[in-house]
């Protein structure tokens, strides 16, 4: 996620006026389409017009050119770019697999981005209004955004990703336009990415029946049996690792860049820095069709026939059955977070639930599972339960979830609930949130063995005092 200035808008639409066919784009790739409820309010649908895109990012109404937000000249933020990147295995399917499977991978990616946009609009998008000298978050009519699908990396490897460029304008539900409140968006950026990836797994499995496997990275040292998982990533099961490494030149160049400058094992921060410093321009003279032929030839040099990728279809039927949410993975991920902070916010739980779903879940289901977990924790935490009640019974009808304090819980409480009570809640998604028997299981007494640790954590929480996430 990065800020977009008006001077950078041309990256997304700069080559559209040339009239290049969509299948031949490399640097600019797709012409882009308008997405989000706010775009509809501005009567912007379908393919992006470059002139209108510049106008909207400049904070002006494309219908009558009136200003939609205050302008601070060159200091104004035009928008925010959220990049949704498919795993390398999905990129390979989309650009090298036989047509039917390739199209399914592309459609699954598009559907997952749309699902993530829905999550943003429900949870992480809004505006700020001042009432009686007090600033409030107010719900908005939806995001004003354009999605640009790109299919190559800067090293010209298969790399399916979408730039979701959200304009820094939004209409509050009371009808007034202004700049957006991006603070909640930045707080939720980890959850947004996890929701996208879970939705992608769900969509692609539903369409093709492929199976998934967790990715163990050297940097993260992800070992499930250790009890703590720094990160959870998934790739399509059954793809030759050689094929994935063959088309990961950009990642390899970043690691080499860090190594040349005396870095050891490249951390996420070092990799981000290297990404921006060691960033080549895309070759405008290449076509996707030409690159696809070159990719297939390169794979053939290593004895790999991309046509064999079709055998991945339907593998989920042969895989051992698994829970919709892996309880051990969920607990391990939350335990890792608990080593870094004494409390967990709702967005942390959403991200963990999404990451721990082997075959993925739609965003609304991820939210429902996370809410079920939060409710189970709140049953044993009067403060958290009061927060949930306050959110549900806000006296101001214009305020939505984005306008109130996000609920949060003692991290140890969340981990304990997952370990001791949550397994029956996630074993059958059909029962989550709708079965009174399951709700009763969530209200089970806290094991006495955990009481001393619970009291210590709660005392630590009380010393911190009540704070909103704005601070």
Mark where each language-model region is.
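Short, amphipathic alpha-helical interaction segments positioned at domain boundaries
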Residues: 388-403
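Intrinsically disordered, flexible peripheral segments
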Residues: 1-332, 337-338, 345-354, 367-371, ...
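Short, positively charged loop/turn segments that connect secondary-structure elements
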Residues: 357-366
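Intrinsically disordered, low-complexity regions enriched in polar/acidic and amide residues
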Residues: 1, 386-389, 420
């Amino acid at each position: 996620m990065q800020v977009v200035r008006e001077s950078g808008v041309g990256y997304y639409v700069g080559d559209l006026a040339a009239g290049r066919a969509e299948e031949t784009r490399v640097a600019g790739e797709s012409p882009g389409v308008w997405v989000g409820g706010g775009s509809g309010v501005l009567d912007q649908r379908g393919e992006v017009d470059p002139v209108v895109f510049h106008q909207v990012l400049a904070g002006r109404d494309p219908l009558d050119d009136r200003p939609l937000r205050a302008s601070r000249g060159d200091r104004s933020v035009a928008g925010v770019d959220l990049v949704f990147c498919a795993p390398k295995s999905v990129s390979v399917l989309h650009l090298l697999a036989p047509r039917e499977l390739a199209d399914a991978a592309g459609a699954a990616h598009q559907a997952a981005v749309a699902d993530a946009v829905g999550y943003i609009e429900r949870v992480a998008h809004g505006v700020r209004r001042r009432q009686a000298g007090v600033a409030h978050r107010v719900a908005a009519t939806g995001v004003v955004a354009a999605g640009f699908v790109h299919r190559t990396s800067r090293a010209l490897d298969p790399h399916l990703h979408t730039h979701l460029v959200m304009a820094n304008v939004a209409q509050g539900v009371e009808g007034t336009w202004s700049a957006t409140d991006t603070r909640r968006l930045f707080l939720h950026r980890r959850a947004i990415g996890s929701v996208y990836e879970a939705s992608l797994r769900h969509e692609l499995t539903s369409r093709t029946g492929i199976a998934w496997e967790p990715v163990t990275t050297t940097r993260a040292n992800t070992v499930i049996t250790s009890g703590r998982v720094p990160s959870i990533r998934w790739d399509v099961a059954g793809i030759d690792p050689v094929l994935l490494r063959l088309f990961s030149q950009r990642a390899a160049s970043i690691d080499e860049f860090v190594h040349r400058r005396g870095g050891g094992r490249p951390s996420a921060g070092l990799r981000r820095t290297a990404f921006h410093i060691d960033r080549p321009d895309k070759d405008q003279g290449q076509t996707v069709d030409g690159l696809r032929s070159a990719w297939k030839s390169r794979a053939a040099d290593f004895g790999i026939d991309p046509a064999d990728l079709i055998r991945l279809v339907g593998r989920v039927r042969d895989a051992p059955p698994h829970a919709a949410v892996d309880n051990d993975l969920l607990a391990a991920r939350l335990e890792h977070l608990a080593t870094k902070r004494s409390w967990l916010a709702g967005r942390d739980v959403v991200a963990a639930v999404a990451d721990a779903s082997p075959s993925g879940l739609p965003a609304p289901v991820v939210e429902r599972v996370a809410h079920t977990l939060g409710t189970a924790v709140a049953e044993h935490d009067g403060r958290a339960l009061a927060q949930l009640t306050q959110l549900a019974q806000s006296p101001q009808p214009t305020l939505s979830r984005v306008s109130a304090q996000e609920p949060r819980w003692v991290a140890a409480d969340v981990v304990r609930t997952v370990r001791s009570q949550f397994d029956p809640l996630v074993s059958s998604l059909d029962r989550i949130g709708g079965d009174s028997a399951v709700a009763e299981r969530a209200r089970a007494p806290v094991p006495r063995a955990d009481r001393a640790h619970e009291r210590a954590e709660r005392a630590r929480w009380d010393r911190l005092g009540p704070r909103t996430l704005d601070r």
